[in-house]
Amino acid sequence: MKKHIGISLFFMGCFLSLSATNYFVATNGDDSNAGTLDKPFATLQKAQSKVVPGDTVYIRGGEYRIREEQMMGGDHLRAYVFEMNKSGTQAKRICYTGYQDERPIFNLAEVKPEGKRVSVFYVSGSYLHFRNFEIIKTQVTIREHTQSECIYNQGGNHNIYENLAMHDGMAIGFYLVRGSNNLVLNCDAYNNYDPVSENGTGGNVDGFGGHPASASYTGNVFKGCRAWYNSDDGFDLIKAQAAYTIEDCWAFYNGYKPGGFVGAGDGTGFKAGGYGMRSKVKMPNEIPHHVVKNCLAYKNKNKGFYANHHLGGI
């Protein structure tokens, strides 16, 4: 059922290289090891501490049950599980990928920092490539209005997120506020519902959120992605200050609690913009014109395609 969109990524892909270092992480590894195929690290945190531009981290298959003491950073609002703050270069990306046809899964069920939003992959680095793994059971602990994110691109540019699945948790699948020229390719977000905050309304759990906070954050793309059974919207561009492109994507069964048709949040398939209806909302100097093309919406709770009063239309 997966719809793969072809794109020429060979020159920026992850592959075994003779001119850079390849590190390995495995469920039976040890962070005192050398990080080789035969003696892998145990954690992605250890591998990330070693990489330089051009390196690749291969993550062996299996389930990685993440613990709170493994968190790499945070601020007054968020806890960062994996703080991806190292950058590659245009010629030498840093890659984090499932090994060959193996499918690693990061399980966040035990990460419940009190009073904090959870950002599983907090990405401020640039020229990174994340590929072929899953993030499950991301938690929410705050009772008031809040959110958690499986992937939060906060300042990273020229990143690729490919063939990832963010599912069966309480968090937004992918969320961008700062950064330019980021490609989210062939990724899935599904079965995500927050029963904890705001009495379980589920109104802040989108599949994919593109919300660039500056007109300079251009060139961001969702391509070949699917969103279903997210308790709010499938794809949401509300308050975006720069144009976003959504291409060849699917949105279905959003706005419901997973597994049935019990209503939860807004339930729009593709919510392409808008700045709210309050009289004091600050508009950007130039309203961005989002592009949504070759996309499919089916049986979302509210609308399939909705400009959300966006002055630039779609």
What are these model-predicted stretches?
Residues 1-21:
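Bacterial Sec-dependent N-terminal signal peptides
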Residues 18-46, 63-65, 100:
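Right-handed parallel beta-helix/beta-solenoid
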Residues 21-22, 53-56, 92-93, 101, ...:
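Loop/turn elements at helix/coil->beta-strand transitions in domains of secreted/extracellular proteins
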Residues 45, 49-53, 66-95, 105-131, ...:
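Extracellular beta-strand-rich solenoid/capping regions of secreted or surface-exposed proteins
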Residues 52, 86, 91, 101, ...:
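Parallel beta-helix/beta-solenoid
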Residues 60, 97-99, 107, 123-124, ...:
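Feature marks extracellular polysaccharide-active and adherence modules
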Residues 72-84, 111-121, 143-152, 168-176, ...:
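Extracellular beta-strand/beta-solenoid scaffold signature
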Residues 243-254, 258-269:
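Acidic, glycine-rich loop-and-beta core segments that form the ion-binding/anion-interacting portion
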